[in-house]
Each structure stands twice: as structure tokens, then as C-alpha cells.
From Swiss-Prot:
<feature type="glycosylation site" description="N-linked (GlcNAc...) asparagine; by host">
    <location>
        <position position="4"/>
    </location>
</feature>
<keyword id="KW-0325">Glycoprotein</keyword>
<dbReference type="GO" id="GO:0016020">
    <property type="term" value="C:membrane"/>
</dbReference>
<dbReference type="GO" id="GO:0033644">
    <property type="term" value="C:host cell membrane"/>
</dbReference>
<feature type="topological domain" description="Cytoplasmic">
    <location>
        <begin position="68"/>
        <end position="116"/>
    </location>
</feature>
<keyword id="KW-1043">Host membrane</keyword>
<keyword id="KW-0812">Transmembrane</keyword>
<keyword id="KW-0472">Membrane</keyword>
<feature type="topological domain" description="Extracellular">
    <location>
        <begin position="1"/>
        <end position="46"/>
    </location>
</feature>
<feature type="glycosylation site" description="N-linked (GlcNAc...) asparagine; by host">
    <location>
        <position position="12"/>
    </location>
</feature>
<feature type="transmembrane region" description="Helical">
    <location>
        <begin position="47"/>
        <end position="67"/>
    </location>
</feature>
<protein>
    <recommendedName>
        <fullName>Uncharacterized protein ORF80</fullName>
    </recommendedName>
</protein>
<keyword id="KW-1133">Transmembrane helix</keyword>
């Protein structure tokens, strides 16, 4: 028999001893997993906080997008014209006009001055 084989007690079966590399790999994996588990339990509140913050940012961005695209308080006909313009169903008289900033649009009288 070779150096790396043994006979199982009470049987005639030959067992091959574990390779040293496999033992080292197993030991390293156990140490790495225990260290990861330790770090996760230690930093769990921070990880959950960061995840919740990122999720909240995405939810706020999505809701803001819905509000911006579905807002009828600015100029509802501009969004309808934009949709027709993009889809190519706009007639020659209907073209998309971007919103213009003016004192009248902002609810100011024409004689009011902008504050610097």
C-alpha cells in the first residue's frame, strides 16, 4: 500500500487520506466565512441603512418622474402636443413649444421685479 492510503477499521476497504491542499482550502473557506459572518453581524445596521437609503432615493425619483410626466397643473396641452409630436400624429399646426419662463407664467404681474 502507498503512503496516502489506510484501511478502514473492521473492513477491507482502502480509504485515501485527504489531500493537504483540500484541507488548507477548507480551513481558509471556514475562516473567510466566519469572518464575513462576523462582519455582517457587526455592520448590519449600516448595511440596512445604506440599502434603505438607496431604495428611498429610487422611490422618490420614480414618484417625481410620475408627477412630472403626469402633472396637469403646468400646461396640460403641452404634454398632449408633445406626445402627438413624438408619435408623428401631429398636424402642421400642432408643434411642441417648450415652456418659456416669464413673469406671467410664474404668477407675477408684468410690473413686478425679480428679486436678485
Amino acid at each position: 500500500m502507498g503512503d496516502n492510503t489506510t484501511v478502514a477499521p473492521g473492513t477491507n476497504q482502502t480509504l485515501v487520506e485527504e489531500d493537504l491542499g483540500a484541507q488548507i482550502t477548507h480551513t481558509l473557506m471556514v475562516q473567510i466565512m466566519s469572518k464575513l459572518n462576523e462582519m455582517l453581524t457587526e455592520y448590519q445596521p449600516q448595511i440596512i441603512g445604506i440599502g434603505a437609503t438607496v431604495l428611498a432615493i429610487f422611490v422618490i425619483m420614480f414618484i417625481s418622474l410620475l408627477i412630472i410626466l403626469g402633472c396637469n397643473c403646468i400646461r396640460p396641452y403641452n404634454f398632449k402636443n408633445l406626445k402627438r409630436y413624438i408619435t408623428g400624429k401631429a398636424s402642421k399646426s400642432v408643434e411642441y413649444q417648450p415652456l418659456k419662463m416669464s413673469a406671467v407664467n410664474m404668477g407675477m404681474d408684468e410690473d413686478d421685479e425679480f428679486l436678485a
